[in-house]
C-alpha cells in the first residue's frame, strides 16, 4: 500500500498500483500472533492481585460474583437481591445507588439516572444518543462533544459523565463484594456487550478506575456466559449459540467449546435492543389508552412516565408466567386512577417486530462462521428478556424445533463467567484447564487513496493479536504520511468509525514507492488498540493508543472524577454516620420514656421519674427542631448528655449504686448504658 498526498491532505494508495509501474518489491509481514487471552494458570504467571471480583455491568441491572476455594458465589446486596438496579439518584440529602435509587424514581425522575450504559463511550451527536435522549426523563447535555447528565445536587446544577455514573455503580458492586469478603477489593474483571467498540470498552475501564478498581480484563458478555455454561460440559466439541437479550443490549455469539477451550467463532448484535425497548412499547400503549379514556396526554410528564415505566416492567415480567396482568396506578395524573389489562397476546403483538429483529444477528453469526443451523449443538439463553415465551418460541422455531438450554440463571450467568475469569487471574484452584480465545468485534484498518478502507485486522480475529504491513508513498519526495485508523465493515472509510489519526514526518526525499513504511496494529486482550508506523529507512517511528481522538477521558479528567468519587464516598459515610447517631439518640430517648412509663417507673422515686421524662422529652423536642440540620457530633453530644442524666438514676436499680457515680461517668459507662437501651427497630 502507498501513501498519497492530495490537496485535501495526505492519503494512502494501494501498493499494487505503484508496484506495477515501478517494480518495487514489497514484503507484507505475516506475523499475526493468534495467541489469545489464554486462561491457563501457571505458578509464575499469576500476580498477587488479592481477590479479583467479576462484575456484569448491565444496562438495567448489574451483578457481582467471586470465586473462592474453587466455588463461584453470586453476591447479594443489602436488600438480599442478587442483581442490583443500575440506577443512581441524587436527593437534597444524599446519593442513592441500586434498589434505593430505583424505588424513588417516580418521585424524583429528573435526578435519577439509569440506562447510562447506552451513552458511555459515544459522541453526543451520535444518532443513537439523540434517539435515547427523547426517552430519558433526566437532562442529557453536550459536554465537549460527549453526552453527560445534568442533575441538581444540593440545590446546584452538577454535570456527570457516563464514566462517573458507571463508576458509582461499579463502586456499589465493589462495596457489595467487600461487605461479603470482609476485606478491601482492588481488582476486577468487567463485562461489556460483544459489539461495544474500542471507545466504549476504554470508557468502561475508566469507570472502573473512578470506582477504585483496576480492571484487569474487559470480557465480552456472551463469552463470560459461555464460561459459566461450559464448565461442566463433556470433552467432545460443542458449537454453541449464546443468545444474550438483556435490558438494553442484544448480543449473539457462536462459540466452540472443546476440552475446556472456549473459542468465539463469530459475534453480532444490536447495542440498542433489549427489555427496555419492550417496556417502552407497553408504555406507549398505556399512554394511548389513557388519552383515549380521559383526554389527557402524559407523554411529556416525566413523573407519569416513570410510574408507567415501573409498572410496564412489572407487567412484562408477569406475562412470562401468566396469560394476562392488571396494571393499576392510583392517582396517576390529576387524581385520576389508571387501570388497564394487558394480555400476553397483546404484549407479543406490540413487540413482535422487535422479537423478530433478534433473529437477524443469529443469521449473521452463522454466515460469518460458515456453519448451518444443524451444526449448532446448544442454544444458551442469557439475559432476563430471554424469559419471554415468544422470544424462546421464535428462536427454537428458527432452529427447526431445537430446544434452548435453560440450565443457567440468565440474570447471573455473565457475572458467574466473569468471576471464573477473575479466579484464573487471581490463581484460584479448579480453573487450571480453562482456556479462552476471544475475538475482535469489528474490522480494523486504515484509509487508502480514494477513501478506501484497507483492513489490517479483520473482524472475528482471535485476540490479542498483532498485524503489520508495508506501505509506501505515492508522491515523489513526500515528507509526511497521515495514518487514519478506522473500525467497521464498510468498503469506504467515511462510512466507518474514525478511531484516531497521526502523522509520520521526516521521511527523506525519495521517488514514490521507494520509502517503506511499516504500519503495525496491536490489539490487546481487552480489545484496546495501539497503532504504530515506522519508516524502515530511517527507523523513525510514531504511534497512537487510541485515546482522545475517540472522545475518551484524559488522565486529568479521570483523576478529577476519582477525586469526586472519593468525595461522594466521604459524604456518603458522613450521612451514614449522621443517620446512625440520630437513630441511636432517638431510640434511646423513646426507650427511656417507655420504660419510665412502664415497669421501670414503678421502681423509681417520683423526682427521678420526672427528671428522666423531662430529659427525654427535651431531647425529642430538640430532635424535632434540629433533625435535618444537626451533624453526627451534635447527636452524639446529646446522647452523652442524656446518658449522664440517666446513668445515676438507673444505676441505683441495676448497679446498686447510690447515685454518686455521676461525677465518675466515662465512655465505658456510656457504652454499657447505650447497649442497655439501644436496640434495632423491627
From Swiss-Prot:
For region Nucleotide-binding (NBD), the annotated ranges are 146-300
Q: Record's PROSITE patterns?
A: ER_TARGET (PS00014), HSP70_1 (PS00297), HSP70_2 (PS00329), HSP70_3 (PS01036)
| Entries under InterPro entries matching the protein | ATPase_NBD, BIP_NBD, Heat_shock_70_CS, HSP70_C_sf, HSP70_peptide-bd_sf, Hsp_70_fam
Q: Cellular component GO terms, alphabetically?
A: cytoplasm; endoplasmic reticulum; endoplasmic reticulum chaperone complex; endoplasmic reticulum lumen; endoplasmic reticulum membrane; luminal surveillance complex; membrane; nucleus
> What EC designation does it have?
3.6.4.10
The keyword ATP-binding belongs to this UniProt entry's keyword annotation: yes
The record lists the catalysed reaction(s) as: ATP + H2O = ADP + phosphate + H(+)
Annotated stretches, region: Substrate-binding (SBD): 420-520
Acidic residues biased stretches: 664-675
Ranges for the region named Disordered are 652-682
The UniProt record gives the binding positions of ATP as 58-61, 117, 247-249, 313-320, 384-387
Which cysteines in this chain are paired by disulphide bridges? none
**Is-annotated flag, keyword Cell wall biogenesis/degradation?**
no
UniProt-listed CDD domains:
ASKHA_NBD_HSP70_BiP (cd10241)
Activity regulation: the record says: The chaperone activity is regulated by ATP-induced allosteric coupling of the nucleotide-binding (NBD) and substrate-binding (SBD) domains. In the ADP-bound and nucleotide-free (apo) states, the two domains have little interaction. In contrast, in the ATP-bound state the two domains are tightly coupled, which results in drastically accelerated kinetics in both binding and release of polypeptide substrates. J domain-containing co-chaperones stimulate the ATPase activity and are required for efficient substrate recognition.
* Assembly: Interacts with EPS1, PDI1 and YOS9.
Stored PANTHER family: HEAT SHOCK PROTEIN 70KDA
Function per UniProt:
Probably plays a role in facilitating the assembly of multimeric protein complexes inside the ER. Is required for secretory polypeptide translocation. May physically associate with SEC63 protein in the endoplasmic reticulum and this interaction may be regulated by ATP hydrolysis.
Query: What additional remark is attached to this entry?
Result: Present with 337000 molecules/cell in log phase SD medium.
Which family does the record assign? Answer: Belongs to the heat shock protein 70 family.
Q: What protein am I looking at?
A: Endoplasmic reticulum chaperone BiP
List the source organism.
Saccharomyces cerevisiae (strain ATCC 204508 / S288c) (Baker's yeast)
Lineage, uppermost ranks = Eukaryota, Fungi, Dikarya, Ascomycota, Saccharomycotina
